[in-house]
């Protein structure tokens, strides 16, 4: 990757990066929910993250997940997964390796899903809405959940805990991880630093907002994300980009972040070219405090592109 020379780690930055990664994992299991769960005469109704009410007459026994990010949550909640989508980033827990593969996270094999006769499909918000009508036409209930922010994840645990009959277990896990997060934050340096989080793909470079995975964790670490200084933060394109804002070098120079984190998606060579062309080739890049102080850090894809699960908890 470009600018490898910026990987000089001070003691405080080692601590911050370590805390960032640990919290990214803890975030997968904690947050807060205002969504509804109702039980009436054996019928359970939930409201998912798209505001849809979904009814169940019994506990689902055959679950298909359209994102591997849900697998480790379902593992600790003893969910029976019969089908799963794959990703090149998120590893598959051992308990789900024998589950049928239903395509990749961005390209679901709908025929395979229907063949499995699931009684619950867990879909990722902003990614799988196009499949809902087809699955419901086949009598399969679909619950859409988000897994980006601290808040999203606790909600997902509560919903999945209810659906798998493991409500108390889910609440206990969330409580334990809450304590870990609080202990982590207590160890951080007290001074707030300005941070910019760049996200690079082969197509473009954007800034990550507080509702992205990295942005949410940076907020927990009490870092000030400069993108929040934009009066009207809008997404470049579409709902899937709602956690990002357009990249602007002039804005970056004006706000002069003390730390820069970089997340990425795609082929590393293509990303290197994009970062060099759009960001690092400008002489003005060298004037930014984070660059001058060797405080530019690449964050691991497996923790900050998709929800990282429970691997370090």
Where are the regions that the model predicts?
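Flexible loop/hinge segments that line or gate small-molecule binding clefts
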Residues: 92-95, 127-159, 163
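Extracytoplasmic ligand-binding site segments that recognize negatively charged/polar headgroups
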Residues: 130, 146-159, 193-217, 270
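Proline-aspartate-enriched helix->loop->beta-strand connector
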Residues: 102, 109-126, 140, 248-265
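Bacterial Sec-exported substrate-binding components of ABC uptake systems
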Residues: 2-12, 16, 30-69, 168-198, ...
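A short, structured surface patch at a secondary-structure boundary
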Residues: 65-116, 120-125, 223-226, 230, ...
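Bacterial N-terminal signal peptides
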Residues: 20-28
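Flexible, glycine-rich surface segments
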Residues: 204-271
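Structured C-terminal subdomain patch of bacterial secreted/periplasmic proteins
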Residues: 154-155, 162, 171, 182-185, ...
């Amino acid at each position: 990757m470009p600018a490898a020379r910026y990987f000089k780690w001070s003691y405080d930055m080692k601590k911050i990066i370590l805390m960032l990664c640990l919290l990214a994992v803890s975030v997968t299991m904690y947050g807060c929910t205002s969504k509804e769960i109702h039980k009436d005469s054996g019928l359970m109704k939930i409201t998912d993250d798209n505001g849809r009410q979904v009814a169940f007459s019994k506990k689902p026994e055959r679950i298909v997940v359209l994102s591997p990010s849900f697998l480790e949550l379902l593992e600790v909640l003893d969910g029976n997964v019969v089908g799963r989508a794959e990703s090149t980033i998120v590893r598959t827990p051992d308990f789900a390796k024998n589950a049928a593969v239903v395509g990749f996270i961005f390209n679901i094999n709908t025929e395979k899903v229907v063949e499995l006769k699931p009684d619950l499909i867990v879909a990722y918000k902003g990614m799988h809405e196009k499949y809902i009508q087809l699955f419901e036409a086949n009598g399969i209930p679909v619950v859409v959940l988000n897994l980006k922010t601290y808040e999203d994840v606790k909600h997902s645990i509560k919903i999945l805990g209810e659906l798998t009959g493991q409500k108390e277990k889910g609440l206990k896990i969330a409580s334990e991880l809450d304590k870990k997060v609080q202990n982590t934050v207590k160890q951080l340096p007290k001074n707030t630093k300005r941070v910019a989080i760049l996200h690079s793909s082969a197509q473009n470079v954007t800034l990550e907002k507080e509702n992205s995975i990295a942005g949410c964790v940076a907020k927990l670490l009490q870092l000030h994300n400069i993108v929040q200084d934009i009066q009207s933060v809008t997404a470049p394109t579409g709902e899937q980009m709602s956690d990002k804002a357009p990249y602007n070098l002039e804005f970056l120079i004006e706000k002069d972040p003390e730390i820069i984190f970089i997340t990425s998606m795609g082929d590393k060579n293509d990303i290197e070219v994009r970062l060099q062309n759009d960001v690092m080739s400008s002489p003005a890049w060298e004037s930014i405090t984070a660059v001058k102080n060797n405080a530019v850090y690449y964050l691991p894809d497996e923790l900050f592109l998709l929800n990282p699960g429970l691997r370090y908890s």
